[in-house]
């Protein structure tokens, strides 16, 4: 009872905090002069990270196993993984382009996890025999870390495509006030302020769309780095799962729906990474491939759980009618 109460408090504190953080993040993007609020949002992200970490530790202590046995626990772990990704640029002291992706992704993931749809999964239960293995932590954690990483990389690629194919906007015309009313896309707002700041601090001639090009290049670089990491984690997760499957079911690969879609996901991002070796495919063309991968990941992770079919149907749920 004590652990259940603690988990309830921590999840609601973390969700409330991340809701405030994303509001502050949006305000600082729209009103650049309120730069002091950005530090508050980062502190809020850190506080939320510790709340989610506390939840996972509490859940682990109360259930006696690592909390990855159902969709609710996996969503909480997925949001925790997104916090980790959010912190990486801060550790490297580089521009945090990931925050535009990780912050909204976290609130959506955590919001669904704490919604009424998964209420029956909020209470920890005893693991079914097939899941009582040391491979549970290794396999599932690697898969979820790869999902979080690949989702962020795919969204960065999608952001690249949105910026690349939007009509050029004249940010310095008299219609400047209408720009923000036409779009709420964070990266374009960032682009506007980057361009305005650069005009104040540089004296060299600017060719058309130079700062738009810079933003696209930065997004492309981040997307490639994040997807490369996610692909590595996905490969490790699939290999661990194959070893575990052999121990549990006597076969390394069964072409279960989850396994099939994991293989499709791996193939899509392998194609993406291979396309990057061709200079003509860097940027827009490879970003298309990564954007397709975004949909494939959700089918693999969420769609199979929703259907509740196959050998990986543990912890699935059905929509209320």
Curated annotation (Swiss-Prot):
<feature type="transmembrane region" description="Helical">
    <location>
        <begin position="226"/>
        <end position="246"/>
    </location>
</feature>
<keyword id="KW-0934">Plastid</keyword>
<feature type="transmembrane region" description="Helical">
    <location>
        <begin position="143"/>
        <end position="163"/>
    </location>
</feature>
<dbReference type="GO" id="GO:0020037">
    <property type="term" value="F:heme binding"/>
</dbReference>
<keyword id="KW-0793">Thylakoid</keyword>
<dbReference type="GO" id="GO:0017004">
    <property type="term" value="P:cytochrome complex assembly"/>
</dbReference>
<dbReference type="Pfam" id="PF01578">
    <property type="entry name" value="Cytochrom_C_asm"/>
</dbReference>
<dbReference type="InterPro" id="IPR017562">
    <property type="entry name" value="Cyt_c_biogenesis_CcsA"/>
</dbReference>
<feature type="transmembrane region" description="Helical">
    <location>
        <begin position="68"/>
        <end position="88"/>
    </location>
</feature>
<keyword id="KW-0472">Membrane</keyword>
<feature type="transmembrane region" description="Helical">
    <location>
        <begin position="9"/>
        <end position="29"/>
    </location>
</feature>
<comment type="function">
    <text>Required during biogenesis of c-type cytochromes (cytochrome c6 and cytochrome f) at the step of heme attachment.</text>
</comment>
<keyword id="KW-1133">Transmembrane helix</keyword>
<keyword id="KW-0812">Transmembrane</keyword>
<keyword id="KW-0201">Cytochrome c-type biogenesis</keyword>
<feature type="transmembrane region" description="Helical">
    <location>
        <begin position="260"/>
        <end position="274"/>
    </location>
</feature>
<feature type="transmembrane region" description="Helical">
    <location>
        <begin position="289"/>
        <end position="309"/>
    </location>
</feature>
<feature type="transmembrane region" description="Helical">
    <location>
        <begin position="44"/>
        <end position="64"/>
    </location>
</feature>
<dbReference type="GO" id="GO:0009535">
    <property type="term" value="C:chloroplast thylakoid membrane"/>
</dbReference>
<dbReference type="InterPro" id="IPR002541">
    <property type="entry name" value="Cyt_c_assembly"/>
</dbReference>
<keyword id="KW-0150">Chloroplast</keyword>
<dbReference type="GO" id="GO:0005886">
    <property type="term" value="C:plasma membrane"/>
</dbReference>
<dbReference type="GO" id="GO:0009536">
    <property type="term" value="C:plastid"/>
</dbReference>
<dbReference type="InterPro" id="IPR045062">
    <property type="entry name" value="Cyt_c_biogenesis_CcsA/CcmC"/>
</dbReference>
<comment type="subunit">
    <text>May interact with Ccs1.</text>
</comment>
<comment type="similarity">
    <text>Belongs to the CcmF/CycK/Ccl1/NrfE/CcsA family.</text>
</comment>
<protein>
    <recommendedName>
        <fullName>Cytochrome c biogenesis protein CcsA</fullName>
    </recommendedName>
</protein>
